[in-house]
A protein has these predicted regions:
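Cytoplasmic helix-loop-helix junction between adjacent transmembrane helices
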Residues: 113-150
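Hydrophobic core of transmembrane alpha-helices in multi-pass small-molecule transporters
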Residues: 28, 96, 108-123, 233, ...
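C-terminal transmembrane helical hairpin of 12-TM major facilitator-type secondary transporters
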Residues: 265-271, 277, 282-335
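Helix-loop-helix hairpin linking two adjacent transmembrane segments in secondary transporters
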Residues: 148, 152-198
Length: 414
């Protein structure tokens, strides 16, 4: 009985859940790239004789590669077997760490993080996995997406201290080599769980309960896609202000960088809970309403940063912020699955997710520039609130269109 249930490729089945946990593991390991890059910044800068700004180049290249690679791999997994694509990507990803660990010139180190680790490696472990899991669940699709996309928050909670401990014990070169060998030995094994093709790849045929409209919400498909991309940029420009600058904010306030790092870890931990809770809620109310709910909650949390500058109030606000914003990004994947053909899920979800990453990069840069001009983070928070209002306006507009056209947002798309 158990074996037959596991062998079944039905949606929401036993195999679908096993596939989900394997995908979560892959996404979590895929987070090593971002956090090893940031933790190794100071020792790398010392070894190569670089300024902080110069030593930040690998992170910048990684972020660009991670975002652009999400679009590429979204397209690739829409056309080829997910496991095959991820197997190749995981081998490139692990090898990238080995290249970086032996780099004799800084440009080789930087390119290693941008190309094999970022664009060709880690990018395959984010949006393509979200798209893949969305094809395997119907009744609990939102909850499943919330679980798998928690991987990057889990990575943010566990990899920085582990990477720091490895660097302290081995030095940054051997630490990166150890990470590379770990990735090469673990990720290919997990990809074996993803070998089966999705149960339904088309929107036609027996058992299909919902056919994606040719004009979702009355728009051309690319119009809705564009609105989701703009919303993704807007929400993450706002989201990036606390996530990228909370440590610097605490230093400016005289609270110490250690407390800032603890607040960031608290945000990440609360973000995991938020993604699970929001996923469960989205199965009840649909993607559009979940997006609007998350946007409103994030707006409230961002506003709470303005009147408080004490240690304990900022811990509380950081926790509230983490709980508020975790459901926004997963809602885009759910909206895509509710309104577009299943066969397009890979590249459409990959594109929207990549725009959220571009929003994080843009927001972090904008907030830093605003701080440099004004000398405080108050204007940067106001800037984030403005972008959040843009995101909320798009969410309200899309939900209004759905109601106006008597199209009930559904989670039945297959």
């Amino acid at each position: 009985m158990f074996v037959s249930r596991f062998q079944s490729s039905e949606t929401d089945g036993l195999y679908a859940w096993a596939r989900l946990w394997a995908a979560l593991g892959i996404m979590t390991i895929g987070g090593f790239g971002m956090y090893s890059c940031t933790v190794a910044l100071l020792p790398v800068a010392t070894d190569f004789g670089l300024s902080r700004g110069e030593a930040s180049l690998p992170y910048t290249l990684f972020t660009i590669g991670f975002g652009a690679g999400g679009i590429f791999y979204g397209w690739a997994t829409s056309r080829w077997n997910t496991a095959r694509v991820l197997l190749i990507a995981s081998l490139i990803y692990g090898s990238g760490f080995l290249i970086a660990s032996r780099a004799e010139a800084f440009w080789i180190y930087a390119v290693a993080f941008g190309l094999p680790i970022g664009f060709l490696g880690a990018a395959a472990t984010f949006s393509p996995l979200v798209a893949d899991i969305s094809l395997w669940f119907e009744r609990r699709r939102g909850f499943a997406i919330g679980i798998v996309i928690s991987g990057n928050y889990i990575a943010g909670s566990i990899w920085p201290p582990i990477t720091q401990a490895l660097i302290d014990a081995l030095g940054w070169r051997d630490a990166l080599m150890f990470i590379g060998l770990f990735c090469l030995s673990s990720m290919p094994v997990l990809t074996l769980m993803l070998r089966r093709a999705p149960p339904i790849l088309d929107d036609e045929g027996p058992g299909v309960q919902f056919v994606a409209p040719k004009r979702p919400l009355g728009f051309h498909r690319e119009t809705l896609q564009g609105l989701l991309c703009i919303a993704g940029v807007a929400c993450c420009v706002a989201m990036s202000m606390p996530q990228v600058h909370i440590v610097a904010l605490c230093s400016d306030l005289g609270l110490g960088a250690v407390h800032g790092a603890n607040m960031l870890a608290l945000m990440m931990a609360a973000g995991v809970a938020s993604r699970l809770i929001s996923g469960w809620i989205s199965d009840k109310i649909g993607g559009f309403r979940t997006l609007l709910l998350g946007s409103v909650l994030q707006l409230i949390a961002l506003t709470l940063f303005l009147p408080f500058d004490g240690l304990y109030p900022l811990y509380v606000v950081s926790f509230i912020f983490g709980l508020s914003q975790g459901g926004i990004v997963p809602s885009y994947a759910l909206i895509v699955r509710e309104n577009f053909p299943a066969r397009d899920a890979g590249w459409r979800i990959g594109t929207v997710m990549s725009f959220t990453l571009f929003g994080m990069a843009l927001g972090g840069l904008m907030s830093g520039m605003i701080h440099d001009v004004t000398g405080t983070y108050e204007a940067a928070f106001l800037n984030g609130i403005g972008w959040n209002l843009l995101n909320g306006s798009i969410a309200v507009f899309l939900l209004w269109r759905a109601k106006r056209l008597l199209i009930k947002p559904t989670k039945k798309a297959i």
